[in-house]
Amino acid sequence: MINYLFTITTWLIIISYWFIIIIVTCRILSKRRAISSSAAWLLVIYIIPFIGICTWFLLEEPYLGTRKLKLIKSVWSKKNKHFNNLKSHNYIFENNNSEVARSLFKLCKYRQGISGIKFNKLKLLKNTKDVIKNLVRDIYLAKNTIEIVFYIWKPGGLADNVAIALIQSAKRGIKCRLMLDSAGSLEFFRSKWVDMMQQSGIQIVEALKINLLHFFFRRMDLRQHRKFILIDNYITYIGSMNLVDPYLFKKSLGIGQWIDLMTRIEGPISTTMGAIYSCDWEVETGQQISPKRVKNNLIIPTYPIKECTSIVQVIASGPGFTEDMIHQALLTAIYSAQQKLTMTTPYLVPSDDLLRAICTAAQRGVEVILIIPKSHDSLLVKWASRVFFSELLESGVKIYQFKKGLLHSKSVLVDKQLSLIGTVNLDMRSLWLNFEITLVIDDKNFGKSLAIIHNEYISHSSLLDPKLWKIRSYWKKIIEKLFYFLSPLL
């Protein structure tokens, strides 16, 4: 009898095991994902079934939640009213783009429903101290609203200057809203600043809040990765910088300070940023804070028109927003390059399509430069990035490894004319998962400024020698091959 029960139990376990394997396999194959990503998941599931299946359900199957995804789509679609209102001020729109930017701006127009916007004054800020100094000044000068979203806010050092300025502005009647990612800003939410800010009247939202219940129903690595500040619906700061002191942040890793890049904008493009912020805020709180109807005095610039040479688009990406938009934008920008393409990213784990586009650009005579950090804060990303070096080098891509800290800026410059700056890394997480934001800028003067910064990065970098790369140690090649299978999962 015991043997019979044992046999039945064994067969039930075996049948259940293969049933689950088959179900998960069918689910993986039914999703519209890159072949490399599907193959990587299947490999993990068949080699280490229990761990592989559990990891799949935790990282892939629970996405954002059907209910919340529908909410985002619904709220974002309502913002079309704001864009329609903006269209009544037709003199701020510009459809006559430069040749290299034309395809990308057409893509943005037809997929997002709005043309490029002119009359914007842009300034690149490459030093965190300068960013904080300018930001604190603008916060003190705010007249109506201050709206902030960051992935990481780490108290201490320069970050506290912003906190103090916010509190003082709130006390004088400025409406202040602060939205921070729950995981990235965990230290902030455990600090004294939360109570101090709330007591002064600042509204604080913990975005994509982490708790035990969500662990089973939503991806924990899906994060609010946007980083921008909107003041009076007219001034915007946007870029790669988290609200941290670069001299203190992750100091124990011994990789030096973080090097970021931000853009300060004055002009009507900020009204688009306001629509994006109000969407994120409403999704998290249920509170509608849609930007007020745009008036002429908010559109007409207060600075000389001759300074407004930039045509700007904004791409908001993430679950519920325009599907695959940032991936398509990057591909379009790369394929538009005719002379020179420079890209900076801290994390290089591109999709197959992006890798092919970058290599093809180099093979058709475009000078392609990739600037990445030599030291990483993530061992996984470090090895995963190296997987792609051989193919890039063989195609003629120049890879520079930045040595003076962790280069965290995310930028693309095409033919010194078309620029992309924002929060998107060249990795799967930024391209397909996180909530991100990117500026698209058609402006030769801005391109020149960005090129100068890129050259400064290069001056503090070492050029990877293709010959030396080929003769690297055998054990390194083995580790890289192992990470090749895991790279689509990162």
Swiss-Prot record:
UniProt catalytic activity: 2 a 1,2-diacyl-sn-glycero-3-phospho-(1'-sn-glycerol) = a cardiolipin + glycerol
Transmembrane segments: 4-24, 39-59
Keyword Calcium among record annotations: no
GO terms for biological process, alphabetical: cardiolipin biosynthetic process
EC number(s) per entry: 2.7.8.-
InterPro entries: Cardiolipin_synthase (IPR022924), CL_synthase_A (IPR030840), CLS_N (IPR027379), PLD-like_dom (IPR025202), PLipase_D/transphosphatidylase (IPR001736)
The PLD phosphodiesterase domain, residue ranges: 220-247, 403-430
Active-site residues annotated for this sequence: H225, K227, D232, H408, K410, D415
Enzyme class, UniProt record, top EC level: transferase
Principal subcellular localisation of the protein: membrane
4Fe-4S is among the record's keywords: no
SMART domains on file: PLDc (SM00155)
Molecular-function annotations in GO: cardiolipin synthase activity
Record key words, sorted: Cell membrane, Lipid biosynthesis, Lipid metabolism, Membrane, Phospholipid biosynthesis, Phospholipid metabolism, Repeat, Transferase, Transmembrane, Transmembrane helix
Residues annotated as signal peptide: none
Subcellular location: Cell membrane
Gene3D superfamilies with a match to the protein in the record: Endonuclease Chain A
A Gene Ontology cellular-component term: plasma membrane
Membrane-topology descriptor: Multi-pass membrane protein
Function summary: Catalyzes the reversible phosphatidyl group transfer from one phosphatidylglycerol molecule to another to form cardiolipin (CL) (diphosphatidylglycerol) and glycerol.
Family: Belongs to the phospholipase D family. Cardiolipin synthase subfamily. ClsA sub-subfamily.
UniProt protein name: Cardiolipin synthase A
